[in-house]
From Swiss-Prot:
Protein name (database record): Uncharacterized membrane protein At4g09580
Phosphoserine modified-residue sites: 37
Pfam families assigned: VTT_dom
Transmembrane segments: 55-75, 124-144, 147-167, 218-238, 260-280
């Protein structure tokens, strides 16, 4: 009779241990499912953050841009179709410059329209390669006209990306950069009274990628006029450096040559000047 009592006691103990461990196991499972780190395992519903409506809006905007770009493409002579290719290396860029040099001179207005449309399209939909477009502007149009073209197109593309993100970008940014977005939101909240200076600093220096700034700015409630001014002015130093480098494509081996230690130091110096008034104002308040 003792044996059954022992078996019953062991079974009850095992059941008690199992019951006590269940909440912990459940919490751990929930923690894995709710892990928002970029490397964390996502549930099926989290793998693609956009809803059907948001994806439909994004696709519609993309289709409108693509259709407009294709219509501009059709205005070019058929002989030039095969020469059009978005450059991915300095070698591609040199070849594109040689192929389009005469066309850009003969049909300048048409070429500029196509160039601007392509640049804005790439900026709006976060397509890599705009730095090559900036180099191409310097190579084909010189420093002054190339600089104006690049700054205006980069600003227009960033603003277009801003509004697209405001429309459907919140879940995508939260999904891609959850920690970085929380950090950025906290920094913006601390600098509301001097937001333009802070945004200028971010635009001038490579502290945060421009892609992240374009997409996250409407999500952290940065006013559009602040975003526009910071983008227009803040992109000027880097644009000038890139456009000027386009005059000497033969001397460039890779894009990395554009931003050496000296260039980055100059950009950070200019960026520091942009936040100096805010630092001075804070010092006066403390005094």
């Amino acid at each position: 009779m003792a044996a059954p009592r022992n078996l019953t006691g062991d079974g009850g103990a095992r059941q008690l241990v199992k019951d006590e461990e269940s909440p912990a196991a459940s919490s751990a499972a929930k923690g894995l499912l709710n892990d928002d780190s970029p490397t964390g395992k996502r549930t099926k519903s989290e793998r693609f953050p956009l809803s059907r409506w948001e994806f439909a809006v994004f696709f519609t905007v993309f289709l409108v841009f693509t259709t407009g770009l294709f219509c501009i493409y059709l205005t070019m002579p058929a002989a030039e179709y095969g020469k059009l290719k978005v450059p991915r290396t300095i070698s591609d860029l040199r070849l594109l410059k040689e192929n389009l040099g005469s066309y850009a001179s003969e049909y300048q207005a048409r070429f500029i329209l196509g160039y601007c449309s392509t640049y804005i399209f790439m900026q709006t939909f976060m397509i890599p390669g705009t730095i090559f477009m900036s180099l191409l502007a310097g190579a084909l149009f010189g420093v002054v006209r190339g600089f104006v073209l690049v700054v205006l197109n980069a600003t227009a593309g960033a603003c277009s990306c801003f509004f697209l993100s405001k429309l459907v970008g919140r879940p995508l940014v939260n999904w891609l950069w959850p920690e970085k977005l929380r950090f950025f939101q906290a920094e913006i909240a601390k600098r509301r009274d001097r937001l333009l200076n802070y945004m200028l600093f971010l635009r001038i220096t490579p502290t945060l990628p421009n892609l992240f700034i374009n997409l996250s700015s409407p999500i952290v409630d940065i006013p559009f006029h602040v975003f526009f001014l910071a983008t227009l002015v803040g992109l000027m130093p880097a644009s000038y450096i890139t456009v000027r480098a386009g005059l000497a494509l033969g001397d460039l081996r890779s894009v990395k040559d554009l931003y050496d230690f000296k260039t980055l130091s100059v950009l950070f110096l200019i960026g520091s000047i942009s936040i100096f008034p805010a630092l001075l104002k804070r010092k006066r308040v403390y005094e």
